[in-house]
């Protein structure tokens, strides 16, 4: 499977990996699967790893993916999103996606290394858990 995911309900995180020749239809199918997954509910962070993806998304496709994120907001409220992209071209495309998807997350950030992405998510979650519960994107 080019797009796989695992939901850690206790850790409140979706870990998604894109590998191989991922296409837009497969990414959109991933969001349909999340929509139907009973574990995909509440407030969740996202760790997206695209280091093994072999096809660079087109800029025009990033808007469609961002819209898919927005379509499942009634079911799940995404909090923080860390994206891991090691290659220069993919890193740049994910920075562009960061702009498209920013309105659906408290914060989105792109990293080159998984451990740095995980550390950032942990720091964001710790700060969030000690702060009031309103979502800044709701205002």
Name each region found by the language model.
Residues 1-139:
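Amphipathic, Lys/Arg-enriched alpha-helical "gate/interface" segment within cytosolic domains
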């Amino acid at each position: 499977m080019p797009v796989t995911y695992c939901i850690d309900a206790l850790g409140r995180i979706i870990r998604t990996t894109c590998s191989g020749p991922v296409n837009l239809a497969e990414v959109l199918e991933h969001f349909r699967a999340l929509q139907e997954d009973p574990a995909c509910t509440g407030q969740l962070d996202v760790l997206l790893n695209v280091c093994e993806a072999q096809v660079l998304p087109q800029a025009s496709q990033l808007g469609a993916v961002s819209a898919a994120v927005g379509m499942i907001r009634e079911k799940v409220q995404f909090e923080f999103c860390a994206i891991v992209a090691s290659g220069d071209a993919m890193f740049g495309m994910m920075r562009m996606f960061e702009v498209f998807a920013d309105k659906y997350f408290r914060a989105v950030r792109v990293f080159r290394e998984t451990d740095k992405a995980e550390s950032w998510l942990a720091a964001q979650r710790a700060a969030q858990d000690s702060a009031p519960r309103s979502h800044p994107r709701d205002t």
